[in-house]
């Protein structure tokens, strides 16, 4: 197993191991890194570049109308719409915060503006991805391509030793730069190339202003000597030999040095320390001037990703020098390597190295002399290291001042370390003495040991329901939502802050408390907890005779069976027959609904470990679906900890291997360990075809949890992997398989292969109302401007003013854009063709993203990455703002107007002509207007008429929409057939009839659950990969409260919201009327809700259809048949899920008084911690970015310990219910992680 760990740690070995078939045996491996917290890195962790490019492409038809541009600049109209659309704007801002905080882990104030993207956009890397000789271009070839394809000219470059390598006394003198002057323009976009991990790249620091002046003087004198040497003695050396100098990075080649506030006291990056002796031919790369990473705006750049030094070894080997010059530069290299090591040591212990100072002083004396010709230098003149006696060197006055400043700067950290060491020592003494005196038990779990009595071990806000058994008094190990004994509800769903406190005893180890208020002390006296007046009657001690299980494997609800406290020790089921039990009370069942699946896994693991029931197992069984075999992988604690530590080192950068075709993503070390171990096992089992298939197709591999016919994909981060593997291994089967995204092709009834069309968007003039009438009730023509766009099988429409069309990266505007900028950008909009394709991820012939390769600079990557995020967010934001939607599978026909149509009603088409001229600011003929009409006929016989900008655009709309209708009708039929096929296959394989198949639940035998087949396309990974704007869609039945009636809605799930559309339009008398489209009903934010499903939803349902069934006792299901052939006989509870929202109340936030009260409460009851209730993602960002100055401002908070509001949704079948629940849980998981990240950041600020 250690050899596998070595392969995982070595990037080159791992890349060669997983690409053994597709790559040549001795091929050079090129590995580079990108920021992990970026939109591109997040999506590449789940999808291939081909799928990513196809999902991101959008086509704009018709261009940008002049009237829309005028409306955007109309301040009066903007003010009126701002007031009327304040709710929509608020939801749009929430969506913006959701997406940015989830992907980039930053606050809202850091979101880049359109001006930033236009400013930092440089050029596209066109024809710049062909790589030779170990993935690098030849110098001459690369230079020609740079000159031909880039408008950026080369700038001045310098060579400098790292600032951190020098002592404080000679920082102004210990610099040797080599400068070659070139007459070229200064580029503001040259930046650092993406960091190479297989061969590390070191980055030089930016010099101070006074250091820069001294450096320039020395550069001129040194350059004059070099020129004289070159002209006088080295005429034989051609100019080509010195062509490498222009690629040596310079700290001042991009901008002035005063613009950057750089931290020189920071340690070097991991790549620099890991590869201090690496030599990289940076001459084959783009000029790495650090203007983007160290820029003032800094929206994307994380300074922790930088290395403070620039290695001279990166360029010296490529410079044509004579023998004496090479001796000089070799000395510089050796000094730099020693300085790097000595600087690391000095930073650790806070001392100055006198050996380094003496050698530096010796070198300074030679430098301060008259300009010595480099060619005349001899090895005897170079600096050497002196061996000094072991007493301290006397410091000069300047050195003493610097030393005192550094000492005062780090004194706080020193005192902190001393305090922590003292606390650790005192804790060890207390534990040793307590164990010796018998005050503690050595068998106490790790979760509760070394904790004071009454100290908080774990805390979270969650939903709680309490049930009580009617007769049973002994907990059962197989208790689940399919309850095996009769129970009644004693406490309905209520939200509490659940606190787990240490008792300091072996049994019970912890105390669970349910708080109704937020003033919670960190340490509380629990000796007299039963007599306290503010005690919640739900509080109980978690004794070792309690049983902790998952109540539901779908929503991961936890159940705790608590027997009577008078029953001590472990209870056997046979005790139930004894007469003594009749004096005890029945058991209580506490059902805990955490905010996310990851949180449920953590609490489940914590509760079991508190009861000394460990979940960690050294042997993990992974099922390989394509082989129908299971592989046991040994993962002991030592190896597991190594992988966790390696994952922490890679938490900020994502490694990517540049293959001949596509990329190979370096996932979390745990997944890499699984990959190498499984490949070894498959080789031994002679499954070479599977290894070759994975190698040639290059899929993204991951883990999934399977239970019967349901697949639950585990996100590829550390917390989700650990929770999913160890917490859910008892209830689910762990599979290792390629991450499946939704296929982009289908087959027609004739067997023809159909490809998914590209989504289209554009401005159109609507000529009919929702009833298909061309005139209103008052006789006027129904004419309105609208913006239509497609997303999968849905055609959305909104008012034209709300639209946000796809624009190039250098033509973007937002609310911060000025009038002058808008006028300049409008000139660019005029040049946009009638058919414009927006593609943030263009691919070359080798499936490589054109702008993401080894030559991509950091600023270029940042601007391109956020542009891709903006494109994806723009599409979701438009769905949030939409007014109506048309299901294209319900469209009967689409056709274009003809020239003869206007003859029937010339007046009407004359009005259409005037409307087109006003909106598009063009001149039209009547026959052109008639050919620009798009007719959409729905299945209910109504006709929708749309007017395009020209006949050509109308024809393009008709062709694209017909392709979409044909594709999505066949795709919908194929999805339904796939569900039916899987259900019939499982019923036949397990010999189950229809009634038995619908009763598959928590108490089903494990062999039945494991042998069930699941379809990866039905339960695809779209929910965790964000490959498409629509996470889930389809018809659902919904009711707002218990005693209302279910109504049918078309529901769309997007990032952070659930959008409901009316399926019917009813008259005043209640009759349904035929309409063209589904109208928007309500938008529900899901960031602050709880989701539960299964039998727990029975509390929200009415008891109906309770007729006695003589054939199936206890069954109250009603058989149903749908138009697409699907049949269902499940109960209502198995088809329903509920969204629970807490009740809010208004509170006065006089924070000064509140803080004073909390301070007094802390003095009385111990240290106060009010961060138990972490705000949601939008609330946290809003509270941080817009802190009000008025302390008496009213704010809203949720009540605790009270019933909330619930919205019940019902699907057609259990399979569809599972799809919706898993999709919502994926999104809730992402939102909860964003909220916790924002809350932890607020605590540190």
Swiss-Prot record:
Compositionally biased spans, kind Polar residues: 1159-1173, 1182-1191
GO MF annotation terms: protein-membrane adaptor activity
Limits of the PH domain: 1030-1229
Compartments (UniProt record): Prospore membrane
Keyword Membrane: yes
Motif (PxP): 385-399
Basic and acidic residues biased stretches: 227-247
Region called Disordered, residue ranges: 207-270, 1154-1192
Consequence of gene loss (knockout): Abnormal prospore membrane formation. Abolishes localization of VPS13 to the prospore membrane. Accumulation of vesicles within the prospore membrane lumen and reduction of phosphatidylinositol in the membrane. Abnormal spore wall formation; the first three layers are synthesized but abnormally deposited and the dityrosine layer is missing. Sporulation specific septins are mislocalized.
GO cellular component: prospore membrane
Top-level lineage group: Eukaryota
Keywords for this protein: Membrane, Sporulation
GO terms under biological process: ascospore-type prospore membrane formation; protein localization to prospore membrane
Entry membrane topology: Peripheral membrane protein
Pfam families: PH_4 (PF15404), PH_SPO71 (PF23207), Spo7_2_N (PF15407)
InterPro entries according to UniProt: Mug56/Spo71 (IPR040345), Mug56/Spo71_PH (IPR039486), PH_domain (IPR001849), Spo7_2_N (IPR029217)
Function summary: Recruits the lipid transfer protein VPS13 to the prospore membrane during sporulation, thereby aiding prospore membrane formation.
Family: Belongs to the SPO71 family.
Designated name of the protein: Prospore membrane adapter protein SPO71
Organism lineage string: Eukaryota, Fungi, Dikarya, Ascomycota, Saccharomycotina
């Amino acid at each position: 197993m250690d050899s596998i760990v070595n392969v995982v740690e070595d990037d080159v070995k791992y890349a060669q191991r997983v690409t053994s078939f597709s790559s040549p045996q001795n091929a050079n491996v090129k590995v580079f890194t990108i920021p992990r917290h970026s939109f591109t890195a997040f999506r590449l962790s789940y999808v291939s570049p081909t799928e990513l490019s196809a999902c991101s492409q959008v086509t704009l038809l018709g261009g940008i109308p002049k009237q829309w541009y005028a409306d955007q600049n109309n301040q009066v109209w903007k003010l009126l719409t701002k007031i009327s659309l304040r709710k929509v704007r608020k939801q749009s801002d929430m969506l913006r915060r959701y997406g940015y905080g989830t992907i980039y882990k930053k606050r809202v104030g850091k979101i880049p503006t359109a001006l930033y993207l236009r400013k930092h956009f440089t050029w596209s890397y066109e024809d710049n991805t062909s790589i030779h000789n170990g993935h690098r271009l030849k110098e001459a070839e690369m230079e020609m391509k740079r000159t031909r394809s880039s408008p950026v000219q080369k700038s001045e470059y310098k060579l400098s030793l790292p600032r951190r390598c020098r002592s404080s006394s000679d920082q102004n003198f210990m610099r040797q730069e080599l400068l070659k002057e070139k007459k070229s323009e200064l580029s503001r976009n040259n930046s650092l190339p993406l960091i190479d991990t297989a061969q590390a790249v070191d980055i030089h620091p930016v010099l101070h202003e006074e250091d820069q002046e001294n450096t320039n003087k020395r550069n001129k004198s040194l350059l004059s000597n070099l020129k004289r040497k070159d002209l006088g003695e080295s005429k034989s050396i051609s100019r080509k030999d010195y062509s490498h100098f222009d690629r040596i990075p310079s700290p001042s080649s991009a901008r002035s040095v005063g613009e950057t506030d750089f931290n020189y006291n920071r340690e070097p990056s991991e790549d620099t320390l890991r590869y201090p002796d690496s030599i990289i031919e940076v001459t084959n790369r783009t000029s790495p001037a650090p203007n983007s990473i160290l820029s003032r705006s800094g929206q994307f750049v994380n300074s922790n990703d930088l290395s403070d030094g620039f290695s001279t070894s990166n360029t010296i080997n490529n410079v044509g020098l004579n023998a004496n010059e090479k001796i000089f530069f070799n000395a510089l290299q050796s000094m730099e390597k020693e300085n790097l090591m000595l600087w690391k040591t000095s930073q650790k212990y806070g001392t100055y190295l006198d050996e380094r100072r003496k050698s530096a002083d010796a070198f300074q004396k030679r430098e301060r002399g008259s300009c010595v010709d480099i060619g005349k230098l001899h090895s005897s003149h170079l600096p050497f290291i002196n061996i000094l006696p072991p007493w301290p060197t006397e410091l000069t006055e300047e050195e003493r001042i610097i030393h005192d400043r550094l000492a005062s700067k780090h004194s706080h950290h020193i005192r902190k370390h001393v305090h922590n060491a003292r606390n650790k020592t005192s804790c060890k003494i207390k534990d040793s003495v307590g164990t010796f005196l018998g005050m503690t038990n050595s068998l106490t779990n790790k979760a509760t040991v070394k904790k004071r009595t009454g100290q908080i071990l774990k805390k979270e806000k969650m939903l709680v329901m309490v049930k009580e058994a009617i007769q049973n008094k002994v907990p059962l190990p197989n208790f689940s939502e399919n309850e095996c004994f009769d129970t009644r509800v004693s406490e309905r769903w209520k939200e509490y802050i659940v606190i787990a406190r240490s008792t300091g005893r072996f049994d019970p180890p912890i105390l669970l408390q349910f708080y109704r208020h937020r003033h919670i002390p960190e340490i509380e006296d629990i000796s007299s907890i039963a007599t306290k007046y503010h005690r919640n009657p739900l509080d109980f001690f978690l004794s070792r005779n309690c049983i902790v299980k998952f109540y539901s494997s779908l929503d991961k609800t936890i159940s705790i069976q608590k027997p009577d406290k008078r029953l001590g020790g472990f209870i056997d089921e046979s005790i139930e027959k004894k007469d003594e039990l009749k004096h005890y009370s029945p058991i209580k069942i506490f059902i805990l609904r955490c905010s996310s699946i990851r949180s449920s896994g953590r609490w489940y693991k914590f509760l079991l470990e508190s009861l000394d029931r460990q979940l960690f197992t050294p042997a993990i069984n992974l099922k390989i679906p394509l082989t129908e075999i299971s592989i046991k992988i040994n993962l002991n604690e030592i190896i597991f900890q190594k992988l966790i530590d390696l994952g922490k080192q890679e938490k900020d950068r994502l490694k990517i291997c540049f293959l001949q075709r596509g990329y190979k993503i370096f996932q979390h070390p745990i997944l890499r360990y699984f990959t190498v171990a499984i490949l070894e096992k498959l080789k031994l089992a002679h499954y070479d075809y599977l290894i070759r298939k994975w190698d040639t197709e290059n899929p993204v591999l991951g883990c999934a949890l399977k239970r019967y016919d349901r697949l639950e994909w585990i996100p590829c981060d550390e917390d989700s992997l650990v929770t999913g593997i160890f917490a859910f291994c008892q209830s689910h089967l762990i599979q290792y398989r390629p991450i499946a995204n939704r296929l982009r092709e289908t087959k027609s009834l004739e067997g023809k292969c159909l490809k998914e069309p590209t989504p289209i968007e554009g401005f159109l003039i609507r000529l009919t109302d929702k009833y298909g009438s061309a005139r209103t009730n008052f006789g006027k023509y129904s004419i309105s401007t609208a913006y239509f766009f497609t997303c999968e099988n849905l055609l959305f429409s909104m008012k034209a003013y709300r639209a946000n069309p796809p624009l190039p990266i250098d033509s973007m505007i937002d609310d911060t854009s000025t009038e002058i900028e808008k006028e300049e950008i409008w000139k660019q909009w005029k040049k946009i063709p009638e058919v414009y394709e927006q593609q943030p991820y263009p691919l070359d012939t080798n499936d490589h993203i054109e702008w993401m390769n080894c030559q991509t600079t950091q600023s270029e990557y940042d601007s391109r990455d956020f542009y891709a995020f903006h494109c994806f967010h723009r599409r979701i934001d438009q769905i949030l703002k939409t007014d109506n939607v048309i299901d294209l599978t319900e469209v009967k026909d689409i056709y274009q107007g003809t020239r003869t149509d206007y003859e029937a009603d010339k007046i009407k088409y004359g009005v259409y002509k005037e409307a087109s001229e006003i909106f598009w600011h063009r001149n039209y003929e009547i026959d052109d207007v008639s050919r620009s009409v798009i007719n959409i006929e729905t299945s209910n016989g109504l006709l929708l008429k749309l007017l395009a900008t020209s006949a050509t655009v109308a024809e393009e709309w008709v062709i694209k929409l017909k392709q979409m209708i044909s594709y999505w009708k066949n795709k919908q039929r194929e999805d339904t057939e796939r569900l039916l096929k899987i259900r019939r296959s499982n019923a036949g394989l397990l010999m189950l009839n229809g009634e038995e198949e619908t009763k598959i639940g928590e108490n089903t035998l494990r062999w039945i659950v494991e042998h069930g087949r699941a379809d990866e396309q039905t339960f695809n990974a779209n929910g965790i990969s964000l490959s498409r704007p629509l996470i889930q869609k389809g018809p659902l039945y919904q009711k707002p409260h218990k005693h209302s009636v279910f109504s049918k809605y078309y529901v769309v799930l997007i990032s952070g919201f659930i959008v409901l559309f009316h399926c019917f339009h009813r008259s005043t008398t209640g009759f349904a009327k035929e309409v063209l489209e589904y109208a928007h009903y309500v938008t529900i934010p899901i960031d602050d809700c709880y989701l539960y499903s299964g039998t727990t939803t029975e509390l929200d349902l009415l008891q109906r259809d309770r007729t006695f069934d003589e054939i199936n006792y206890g069954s109250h299901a009603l058989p149903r048949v749908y138009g697409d052939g699907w049949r269902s006989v499940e109960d209502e509870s198995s088809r329903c899920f509920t969204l629970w929202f807490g009740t809010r109340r208004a509170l006065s936030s006089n924070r000064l008084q509140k803080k004073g009260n909390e301070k007094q409460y802390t003095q009385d009851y111990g240290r106060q911690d009010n961060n138990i209730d972490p705000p949601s993602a939008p609330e946290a960002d809003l509270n941080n970015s817009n802190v009000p100055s008025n302390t008496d401002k009213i704010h809203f908070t949720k009540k605790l310990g009270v019933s909330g509001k619930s919205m019940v949704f019902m699907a057609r079948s259990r399979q569809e219910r599972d799809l919706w629940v898993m999709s919502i849980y994926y999104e809730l998981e992402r939102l909860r992680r964003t909220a916790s990240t924002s809350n932890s950041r607020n605590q540190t600020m």
